[in-house]
Amino acid sequence: YITMHMKNGRANTLSQMEELIVQCYNHPSIAVWGLSNEITAASPVNDSLIENHRALNDLCHKLDPTRPTTMANVFMLDIDSPLLEIPDVNSYNLYFGWYLGELDQNDDFFDTYHAKYPDRCIGFSEYGADANPAYQSAHPEKGDYTESYQCVYLSLIHI
């Protein structure tokens, strides 16, 4: 369930989630069940979207009460969105310092979220900077696709 919500897709999302949980229930590497990925990138938050996520969340907990649920949210989802109240863990795909903004905005984003919701779990589900190993630079810059910038990016993310 990715990028765009379709009102007539609810039965399909529930069926796929059930198949996934039944198939992978005993897999040791599954820590959480993901409800959706960047679903608000091309869809507005509306009642249909919220109800579909509630149904998915309820189904996950019914079929596997031992694992939490999560959503991988795109950065522009409003921090007050009712969608954020549904999963057990809210995760974010953030590319500050690559597609937009500066690297230190990752820290600011998580600090702001945690200050507003100190009791909610949060995850960092996606981040990165594309690179071509053939591109090197003594003075790497955001967006230059050098492996040098990717190293700078990752060293600041992983401190």
Task: Please provide the spans of the model-predicted regions.
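Active-site mouth of glycoside hydrolases
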Residues: 1-103, 107-120, 131-145
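Short, hydrophobic/amphipathic alpha-helical packing segments
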Residues: 110, 150-155
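Conserved small/polar residues in nucleotide/adenosyl-binding loops
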Residues: 158-159
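Conserved active-site aspartate in kinases
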Residues: 126
